[in-house]
Amino acid sequence: MAMNIRKTHPLIKIVNNSLIDLPTPSNISIWWNFGSLLGLCLIIQILTGLFLAMHYTADISSAFSSVAHICRDVNYGWLIRNTHANGASMFFICVYLHIARGFYYGSYLYKETWNIGVIILVLLMATAFVGYVLPWGQMSFWGATVITNLLSALPYIGDMLVQWIWGGFSVDNATLTRFFTFHFLLPFVIVALTMVHLLFLHETGSNNPIGLDSNMDKIPFHPYYSYKDLLGFFMLLLLITFLALFMPNLLGDTENFIPANPLVTPPHIKPEWYFLFAYAILRSIPNKLGGVLALAFSIFILLLVPMLHTSKQQSLIFRPITQILFWLLVANTIILTWIGGQPVEQPFIIIGQIASITYFSFFLILFPLAGWWENKMLKL
């Protein structure tokens, strides 16, 4: 009897082993949907971005008007642009929930998968940042100026590095052109790294909510989780469609409706909402270099999480003290996001500084201590 083609064909069997016959823990919850949702977000962003790039002009004299042209004159251009802009927000919501899931259930102990994930996050942030510059509105221009200028804090090479990135002595046409190039290129690098992410994940198999070995009780991915993922797809598409059609400008900045003007500074320069927590940490430190290092460390601290794991248990499901700390960290990050969007004045300055200190304390001190304490309590 001939073998099934999906198990023998060199190309199809890769798909089969990844999406059809993949042995999956039988008890993974809705929190495990976000990986596939991120894949869907990436596909949506690449497709809508491709159509936008067909009509966009990467030149400072016509970038703003080309975006207006897309919205006014291109067939369904307004829908493509709104989907792309709000798709980015949904992408980051899914990313942060995906990271929070990995943190809560101890998935970071799969070190290769986790570390590749952190690299993907950094590239995603870079892609979103350069993409935000492309419409060439006020916040695009000043956001690019302020954030790239942070590199000048690096000793010796800083000023040279900033001018090299700008392609001149200020944010100008050369900057816009190269940012468009990077914005087009980086998503494909992210696709490649996603493949590596999945490769390492399938080496170990998925984690599960209780953090115990699930080899004795696994089920095929299809049909169980493929249909479960489809439900997530419909919910995500519904949310993106609702945002794009009913509230397209809800998460954007009104300053970006004004064409870029190097002679007029907006009253409050701030990035998109998904970077505000890191921006608040940057602003909390009066020293420029210190702020830049804190900004970088606020993301790269995720690489230290596997090394700082002190508990004998993988998941937080049976660790009440660490659970409380986890939700306090979530609340702390929300406070930082709020502070990042506020003007630099009291009481926001001191709240931001306290929230920044506690953010790092959770990772470096409180979680390791709680894990150690819970180990002691297990022996009682």
Curated annotation (Swiss-Prot):
Amino acids binding a ubiquinone: 202
Residues reported to bind heme b b562: 84, 183
Co-factor: note: Binds 2 heme b groups non-covalently.
Keywords, ordered alphabetically: Electron transport, Heme, Iron, Membrane, Metal-binding, Mitochondrion, Mitochondrion inner membrane, Respiratory chain, Transmembrane, Transmembrane helix, Transport, Ubiquinone
Assigned protein family: Belongs to the cytochrome b family.
Note: Heme 1 (or BL or b562) is low-potential and absorbs at about 562 nm, and heme 2 (or BH or b566) is high-potential and absorbs at about 566 nm.
Name the UniProt record assigns to this protein: Cytochrome b
